[in-house]
Amino acid sequence: MSVKARILVLYYSMYGHIETMARAVAEGASKVDGAEVVVKRVPETMPPQLFEKAGGKTQTAPVATPQELADYDAIIFGTPTRFGNMSGQMRTFLDQTGGLWASGALYGKLASVFSSTGTGGGQEQTITSTWTTLAHHGMVIVPIGYAAQELFDVSQVRGGTPYGATTIAGGDGSRQPSQEELSIARYQGEYVAGLAVKLNG
């Protein structure tokens, strides 16, 4: 019996947009035979009172530890943008992976990124700036290209890039991920999981 490829969807979400996208990514990845999919979030760094006051959404996904990243064949990271970069919470989490870097524990593992922005600014920059950290770990970065047909739809406001799935939350966070954005997220999960299964052989 062949060993299943282990896929981790690892995200940070304050208001729930990236959480919703993460579920869609995991749904797509779960379609692939031979893939075992896990969804986890990085720890919140804001004090609970401030998180609640800011309108943060309580989430049920278990919290990941940096050390466990080595247990997966592919990791799909989800983060909202913060001035064209990953969120501080994701940055803090990845800054704790020095031991994994020193041992080469993530070398050759697949990595892909999806994101959320308020008005669309910084979508691609957030993904590509996150790639920098993953490249230092020797991870194999997987963009999604234009295979998802929704990327060609210009009839409505939507996220989605050849670098990875994205959603536009609106300046006040009131816009939820659209069906088109979720479809692109599912494609990203399915695509990365399919590659991981092939490489797992």
Swiss-Prot record:
One of its GO terms (molecular function) is NADP binding. It is an enzyme of class 1 (oxidoreductase). HAMAP family: NQOR. NAD(+) binds at residue 15. SUPFAM superfamilies: Flavoproteins. Substrate binds at residue 101. FMN binds at residues 13-18, 81-83, 116-121, 136. Pfam families: FMN_red. It catalyses: a quinone + NADH + H(+) = a quinol + NAD(+); a quinone + NADPH + H(+) = a quinol + NADP(+). It comes from Shigella sonnei (strain Ss046). PANTHER family: FLAVODOXIN-RELATED PROTEIN WRBA-RELATED, FLAVOPROTEIN-LIKE PROTEIN YCP4-RELATED. This is NAD(P)H dehydrogenase (quinone).
